[in-house]
């Protein structure tokens, strides 16, 4: 696994067979070491913003990924799995509706830098596949929720935290969601799967209004806090049928409730009410 200097890896200590290489997308030597003797490359890396300049974000992510794919080609890697994003989409065709949800064949017209970078990398991935360097599979998740090594960085943590201490919250907007379990399962389902070569899969479980989510949190943890705000838009209907057909399971809002319970439990075990030095 390629990790940055200072990456949190304590939660991975139980996995004894992981070899760590400290490096980055800018470091070609570390990229070459990463893919040496590897059969499959899972590309999750993204040089983060927003503190970096646009030029730096483009150079590191796009040029760095091209270097990574080139090193994979030299090392004769058999398969590359690239974690893209549904933010490659921007403008929606007028034909998209609940009966005809957006699928993997919908044209991409990203509206922001992150989506544009992911879209550019997808293009390079297909170029390498076309040249028969290796098989490529692209996964496009929406907002991923799951417990992070730094618990306060977990999705919806702040809302759960405020309601756990009986504060009122003001919520607006909405989000598409998928659990980290489904994302991992997506990787497992395409790993070594010849039928997935050259394919794109949407990883999306559902869509929820943040106000609805807040009320779900309050009910789940028996909070006295109140949720106020406005409902978000209904969102663009998206299809996850292709992912389901290869075996990915999406468990809906029941999975969110289990996640809320887990975050609430971990808050108590690792610091409780706002003792963040222990998170």
Q: Which ranges hold each PLM region?
A:
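Amphipathic terminal alpha-helices
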Residues: 253-279
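Conserved Rossmann-fold NAD(P)-dependent oxidoreductase catalytic core, especially the SDR/UDP-sugar
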Residues: 67-113
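NAD(P)H-binding glycine-rich loop region in Rossmannoid oxidoreductase-like domains
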Residues: 7, 18, 22-60, 71
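Active-site Tyr-X1-5-Lys
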Residues: 109-137
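NAD(P)-dependent short-chain dehydrogenase/reductase
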Residues: 127-175
């Amino acid at each position: 696994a390629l990790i940055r200097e200072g990456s949190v890896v304590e939660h991975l200590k139980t996995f004894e067979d992981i070899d760590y290489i400290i490096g980055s997308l800018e470091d070609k030597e570390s990229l070459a070491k990463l893919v040496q003797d590897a059969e499959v490359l899972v590309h999750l890396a993204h040089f983060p913003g927003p503190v970096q300049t646009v030029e730096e974000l483009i150079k590191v992510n796009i040029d760095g990924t091209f270097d990574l794919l080139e090193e994979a080609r030299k090392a004769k890697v058999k398969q590359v799995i690239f974690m893209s994003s549904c933010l490659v989409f921007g403008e929606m065709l007028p034909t998209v509706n609940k009966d005809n949800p957006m699928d993997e064949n919908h044209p991409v017209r990203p509206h922001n830098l992150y989506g544009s970078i992911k879209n550019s990398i997808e293009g390079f991935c297909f170029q390498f596949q076309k040249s028969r360097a290796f098989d490529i599979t692209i996964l496009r998740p929406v907002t991923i929720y799951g417990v992070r090594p730094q618990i306060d960085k977990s999705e919806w943590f702040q809302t759960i935290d405020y309601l756990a201490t009986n504060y009122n919250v003001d919520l607006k907007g909405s989000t598409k969601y998928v659990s980290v379990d489904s994302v991992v399962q997506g990787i497992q389902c395409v790993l070594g799967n010849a039928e997935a070569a050259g394919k794109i899969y949407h990883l999306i479980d559902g869509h929820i209004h943040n106000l609805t989510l807040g009320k779900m949190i309050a009910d789940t943890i028996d909070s006295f806090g109140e949720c106020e705000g406005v409902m978000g838009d209904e969102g663009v209907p998206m299809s996850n049928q292709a992912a389901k057909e290869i075996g990915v399971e999406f468990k809906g809002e029941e999975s969110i409730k289990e996640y809320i319970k887990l975050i609430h439990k971990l808050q108590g075990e690792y610091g409780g009410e706002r003792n963040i030095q222990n998170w």
